[in-house]
Amino acid sequence: MNAGKYLIVFDINGTLIKRYHKYSEELKRYESMGIVADKVSGAFAFYDRPHLDVLLKFLKTHEVSYILWTTGMEKNAKIFVEHLESLGFDEHIGSYSQIDCKAGKYKIDSSADLWVKDLDIVAKDHGFDVERCILVDDSLDKSLYNQNLICCKEYDPENYDDDGIMEICRYLDAFIGCTKECIMKIMHNTA
């Protein structure tokens, strides 16, 4: 059991990155505006949310474990995770996809049949107390109502001033009860 430790479960699409099918209308619109994808891999174009480097520093400084979880299909999840690993998210202790999700009570606007991320699953798989696990997602509908959640704004590549990662780090800092003079406090004091 990882007593005293914390586990952060990151949603992928909309939270850490934004991915589009490389032939999608959204991608064409972004390209017409001069907003170029950070990477194209297979059938997908990826836009990396600003300040991911700060999040990585936060995770290392606080020595917290993390998982990557998408409601996407398993074959696509592998592509998304590989992209995040190339950005430095290579110390995750696991990755999960749609097949690991549960059905919610009410169908959401999604092609996925399973979309709820139950923290009991990852807590049990990795030996954590579920109260020390938190989901970071851009959708309330993908969480269980009685589990820890940071619901962040969905990343939009058009928003050049996106500070979603900074906001996530501030909430995580509070969740884990950090008392150190860590990167979030240093950045907050210099802002």
Where are these predicted regions, by residue range?
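Alpha-helical substrate-recognition element adjacent to the catalytic core
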Residues: 1-109, 186-190
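C-terminal cap/substrate-recognition subdomain and adjoining C-terminal extension
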Residues: 73-191
